[in-house]
Amino acid sequence: MLLNIAVICLAACVGALMRWGFALWLNPGGLIPWGTLAVNLIGGYCIGIALAVFTSRPDIDPAWRLLVITGFLGTLTTFSSFSGEVVTMLMQQRFGLAFGTIALHLGGSLALTWAGMRSALWWLAR
């Protein structure tokens, strides 16, 4: 149990720092918070790969799933920042921008999760 906690904490630290780095790099001054979108899309693709690999390879130690999905990707991606940014847009009556942002995050994340799964399954079948 202690090893699982350590694995999650270590990976969560890396994911959170990467998310912060993307926000510092891409969010300032833009029409939409590009850093938040980037981490959610990258995370969507990566979780698709991870889910396909872990499902196809049940022999992989479960600690790896905790490290990759729960720790790293769980903190790299952010639903809370996305929600806060969209609600702020709505409160500013920037409705088109808010709904466009919702479409980009949800549609993009779902599409890239699917693409990540398909990519990994293709690679594993080779």
Swiss-Prot record:
Transmembrane intervals: 5-25, 34-54, 67-87, 95-115
Membrane topology: Multi-pass membrane protein
Catalytic activity entry: fluoride(in) = fluoride(out)
Superkingdom: Bacteria
Activity regulation text: Na(+) is not transported, but it plays an essential structural role and its presence is essential for fluoride channel function.
A GO term from the CC aspect: plasma membrane
Pfam families reported for this sequence: CRCB (PF02537)
Subcellular location: Cell inner membrane
Keywords: Cell inner membrane, Cell membrane, Ion channel, Ion transport, Membrane, Metal-binding, Sodium, Transmembrane, Transmembrane helix, Transport
Residues bound to Na(+): G74, T77
Any one GO molecular-function label of the UniProt entry: fluoride channel activity
Biological process terms in GO annotation: cellular detoxification of fluoride
Major place of residence: membrane
Family named by the database record: Belongs to the fluoride channel Fluc/FEX (TC 1.A.43) family.
Protein function: Fluoride-specific ion channel. Important for reducing fluoride concentration in the cell, thus reducing its toxicity.
HAMAP family (alphabetical): FluC
Protein name: Fluoride-specific ion channel FluC
Species whose genome carries this gene: Paracidovorax citrulli (strain AAC00-1)
Gene (name only): fluC
